[in-house]
Structure formats: C-alpha cells, structure tokens
A protein has these predicted regions:
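ABC ATPase NBD Q-loop/coupling interface
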Residues: 58-74, 142
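H-loop (His-switch) and adjacent beta-strand-loop-beta switch element
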Residues: 210-219
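Walker B catalytic motif
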Residues: 170-171, 178
Length: 219
C-alpha cells in the first residue's frame, strides 16, 4: 500500500529525515516513535502533501508516485491524516464539513452524493460510538473544542471517510486516560484487513490500547 525508500527531507537547509525506509502493507498497523526532532511529524506532513520540504527518495502509494498526487487526490484515493493540532475553522459547520468531505470522495469514485438526512443518521451513530455530544455536529469545526474533543472529532472523520491508509500524528497528545481509551476504541473498531494505520506517537501508553504489528523508532 505504502512504500518509502531512502526518504531524505529538509526544510530551510536543515536536514530532518536522513534516509527512511518503510513498507506498509494492506491490513497492517505500524507505529513510529522517537524524540522531538527525529522526523516523526515531518513524515506525516510529507505523506499528507504539506509544501515547503525538499525531499528525495521514492514514495509510492498503491504503486503511484506519491509526489505526483495532489493533496485533494490523496484524500480521494483513501489517505487520511489526523492532525496533532487540529485546525479551528470558524464559519464551517462540522456536520456540513464532514458531509462535503465524504461526498468529494464519493464523487471521485463515481458514486452519488449522500443526502443530508441520510448523512445525519450516519454521523449521529458514529458520534455516539465516540461519546461525542450531538451538539458538536452543529458547531463550527473545532472552534471552542477542548483538546480531547478535537482529537475525538478527528477520529469521527476517520470513521466517516473510511480511508485505506490512516496516519495518526500524535493523536494521543494531551489526552487524559478516558479520552485516550475512547480514541483507541474508535481506531480499533475501524481496523480491518482492508485498511492500514501509521501511528506516530511519543508515548508507549497509546500502544497499550492499539496493538501495532510493527514498531519503528526514529533517532
């Protein structure tokens, strides 16, 4: 599904990743650990298409050159990034954002848009699984949300969009144990033989709840 060979990355002439090799097959869960500055979040940024990095090496997603796939196309092709610091977007209703995102992916696959009533039923069901109060669905995206609420909202997006490859960038950061368990349960309920995860974390505690097939340590 994802294959990285000899990835090197720098920004503003500062070398961050100095030759990373990684292969993630369908159905696998990989965890990446390491100290600050080791390149964990840089890797997530590069995979999601964030500009500003000078990179070399081979990055392939489902056999395609990832560097030639736009950010929008990456999402449409089944890539998903849960941010370490989810962005607040004033004026954008959470429910509408989720439905628009899902319909963009459905359109790319040649499927019809899902109507508002049908979607509301789905999103309420998924929100309940994550102990998310329905009132958050009508609020502006992440605006005024606590850290834990933002992280749970990211996992709600994951469960709605159903990506093939989910990249979780320090999703456990700032979570208390109860929120951590809810987030982990949300991830575990989505895991199956058809999707893969790349979990980036500072802490072992997340891996007590989400069991990876492989653990990689960056230095």
């Amino acid at each position: 599904m994802l294959e990285i060979k000899n990835l090197k990355a720098e920004i503003n002439n500062k070398k961050i990743i100095k030759g990373l090799n990684l292969k993630i097959s369908q159905g696998e869960v990989h965890a990446i650990m390491g100290p600050n500055g080791s390149g964990k979040s840089t890797l997530a940024n590069i995979l999601s298409g964030k500009p500003g990095y000078d990179i070399s090496g081979d990055l392939k997603y489902e056999g395609e050159d990832l560097t030639q796939i736009s950010i929008e196309e990456r999402a449409q092709k089944g890539m998903f990034l849960a941010f370490q610091y989810p962005t607040e977007i004033p004026g954008v209703n959470t429910n509408n954002f989720l439905r628009t995102s899902l319909n963009s992916i459905r359109k790319a696959k040649g499927h019809k848009d899902i109507d508002a009533i049908s979607f509301l039923k789905i999103v309420k069901e998924k929100a309940k699984e994550l102990s998310i109060d329905e009132k958050f669905l009508s609020r502006h995206l992440n605006v005024g949300f606590s850290g834990g609420e933002k992280k749970k909202n990211e996992i709600l997006q994951l469960k709605i969009l159903e990506p093939k490859l989910a990249i979780l960038d320090e999703t456990d950061s700032g979570l208390d144990i109860d929120a951590l368990k809810i987030v982990a349960d949300g991830v575990n309920s989505y895991k199956n033989k058809n999707n893969s995860f790349l979990i980036i974390t500072h802490y072992q505690r997340l891996l007590n709840f989400i069991k990876p097939d492989f653990i990689h340590v960056l230095s």
